[in-house]
């Protein structure tokens, strides 16, 4: 993809997404503990009676009884589709990070430094005048390249570049601990490629309005990027039809929970033989340049999906595949382009799908760019300002206490064998 566009990857999709949920829980738990080191939050009671709604009987509506007071104190803001205690942490954290970025815009950073890059990305996100003036210009070169793609190596190269930069067309890949040998890492291939994420949005009749709204979004994005309206509508319909067939091949959420069924090691030779619509040598070569090399096998999550995807790619006209890639690209890029692109994206993904009433303020959108692109550098800055050494010592002590308590609990279990206890203690 062209270096002109600053785009971010979509959230992890399908089974890979499910497998990373615990990491997010740990991240927010850590953030909560870090923020609790602050004197102000340390005084907050573990159970605040004002968060209850005592006017409701717990046996009638326990949720309202337990959280009614908190809900009254924290009304749902128009930019949210839901709001809970973790969202409070996220909101507080965003304010802190934004303060860091604002401070950086006031200093003279060394050219080429991380500070300068973070500052430039942040200011670029805030510059609505520039973004609206540029319109689709930042993505035109990439779109032109996509519309020249042919089946074979060129298609796989385009897919891989997009997977590394802006999304997961057709399928997703990732490296994580081997589920059968946690001491080694494995290369995973998982189903993906649906613009709306969930197969049910395409296949369930009750979601017909969403499916229509998605088609209208794609047509609008194609028009904004320079396609004639009639052609844009036809292309959008073709893309949705293609994704619907991809959804038919996709596993349901229930099927994705079957870990044993989702563990299917295959050699590279097997991949080439079974799923020959993809040029696996090209994919691995591209990955080896930037991310991971020496792949000799893959764990395929959903073999039947890949069989269906392989057949679908072979029988689909190249023009439809080009527009499909363009749709994947534009839905990822829309939030970082001009206001008309962002509004189109929000009207569908934010308003129609999620029930949000209002766009996120620009400062939050701007703040999220360097926070995503240069997250490790931002994290280092955050820790330096908000997590002093004394708080780290307290956190290490807390973790140590948890390990000790869990170890004692495991040792006292009468239903666990000694061998299993030993393995459990190792994991602590």
Task: Enumerate the predicted regions with their spans.
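Positively charged N-terminal leader segments that act as targeting/secretion signals
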Residues: 4-7, 11-13
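Sec-dependent signal peptide hydrophobic core
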Residues: 26-30
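C-terminal motif of bacterial Sec signal peptides marking the signal peptidase cleavage site
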Residues: 35-36
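Short, Gly/Pro- and small/polar-rich lid/capping loops
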Residues: 41-50
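Active-site-surrounding "flap" and adjacent substrate/cofactor-binding loops of secreted or lumenal enzymes
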Residues: 57-60, 65-125
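Noncatalytic, helix-rich "gating/capping" subdomain that lines the substrate-entry/channel surface
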Residues: 105-396
């Amino acid at each position: 993809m062209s270096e002109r566009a600053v785009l971010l990857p979509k959230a992890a999709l399908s089974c890979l997404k499910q497998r990373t949920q615990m990491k997010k829980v740990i991240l927010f738990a850590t953030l909560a503990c870090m923020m609790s080191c602050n004197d102000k939050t340390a005084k907050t009671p573990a159970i605040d009676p004002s968060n209850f709604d005592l006017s409701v009987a717990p046996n009638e509506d326990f949720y309202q009884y337990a959280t009614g007071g908190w809900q009254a104190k924290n009304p749902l803001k128009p930019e949210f589709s839901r709001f809970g205690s973790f969202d409070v942490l996220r909101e507080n954290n965003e304010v802190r990070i934004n303060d860091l970025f604002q401070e950086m815009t006031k200093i003279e950073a060394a050219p080429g430094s991380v500070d300068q890059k973070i500052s430039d990305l942040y200011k670029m996100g805030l510059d609505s005048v520039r973004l609206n003036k540029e319109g689709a210009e930042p993505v035109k070169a990439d779109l032109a390249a996509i519309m020249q793609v042919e089946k074979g190596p060129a298609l796989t190269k385009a897919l891989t570049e997009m997977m590394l930069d802006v999304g997961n067309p057709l399928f997703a890949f990732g490296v994580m601990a081997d589920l059968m040998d946690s001491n080694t890492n494995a290369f995973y291939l998982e189903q993906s490629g649906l613009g709306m994420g969930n197969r049910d949005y395409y296949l369930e009749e009750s979601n017909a309005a969403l499916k229509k709204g998605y088609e209208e979004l794609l047509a609008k994005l194609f028009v904004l990027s320079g396609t004639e309206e009639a052609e844009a509508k036809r292309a959008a319909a073709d893309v949705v039809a293609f994704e619907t067939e991809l959804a038919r091949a996709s596993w349901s959420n229930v099927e994705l929970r079957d870990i044993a069924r989702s563990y299917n090691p295959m050699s590279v030779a097997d991949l080439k033989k079974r799923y020959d619509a993809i040029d696996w040598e090209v994919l691995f070569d591209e990955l080896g340049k930037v991310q991971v090399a020496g792949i000799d096998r893959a764990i395929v999550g959903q073999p039947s999906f890949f069989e269906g995807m392989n057949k679908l790619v072979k029988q689909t006209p190249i023009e439809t595949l080009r527009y499909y890639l363009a749709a994947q690209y534009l839905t990822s890029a829309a939030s970082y382009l001009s206001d008309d692109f962002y509004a189109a994206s929000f009207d569908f993904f934010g308003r129609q799908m999620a029930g949000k009433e209002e766009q996120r303020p620009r400062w939050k959108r701007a703040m999220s760019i360097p926070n995503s692109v240069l997250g490790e550098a931002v994290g280092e800055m955050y820790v330096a300002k908000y997590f002093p050494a004394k708080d780290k010592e307290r956190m290490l002590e807390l973790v140590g206490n948890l390990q000790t308590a869990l170890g004692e609990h495991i040792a006292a279990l009468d239903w666990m064998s000694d061998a299993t206890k030993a393995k459990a203690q190792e994991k602590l």
